[in-house]
């Protein structure tokens, strides 16, 4: 039997329980066709790069599959029919990765506390402190005088 990684996207208006039920449904299809499912990861609701069927977000799920090609074809056929599945992708792999996937590691990294203090959007200025106000106030354009506005009618 061949090894596969299978990722699918489910509609954004589904609940997490419905996505889990969808995973269990496809797990049953694989097992009924002589395969087995190893690791299953639910990556949660994430933003899409572009809209798919008027959806801006989707629930992502990953399954590690050890099954014959016929089982994978049957799962893909059922996913094409199901309107709750927006996209799917199956990739043949040499071996399944051990431990959490890169997406789950990224989620763990995002949960860690930040180290950059009270200004996370700017670089560290060291011991220099803030710059303070500019000379001349807001109206100043340096050594250049301000031109009068032309009325366009």
Swiss-Prot record:
GO term, biological process aspect, one: translation
The keyword rRNA-binding belongs to this UniProt entry's keyword annotation: yes
Annotated Gene Ontology cellular component terms: cytosolic small ribosomal subunit
InterPro entries the UniProt entry points to: Ribosomal_bS6, Ribosomal_bS6_sf, Ribosomal_S6_plastid/chlpt, Transl_elong_EF1B/ribsomal_bS6
Keywords: Ribonucleoprotein, Ribosomal protein, RNA-binding, rRNA-binding
Region ranges (Disordered): 94-153
Family of the protein in this entry: Belongs to the bacterial ribosomal protein bS6 family.
Protein name (record): Small ribosomal subunit protein bS6
Taxonomic lineage of the native organism: Bacteria, Pseudomonadati, Pseudomonadota, Alphaproteobacteria, Hyphomicrobiales
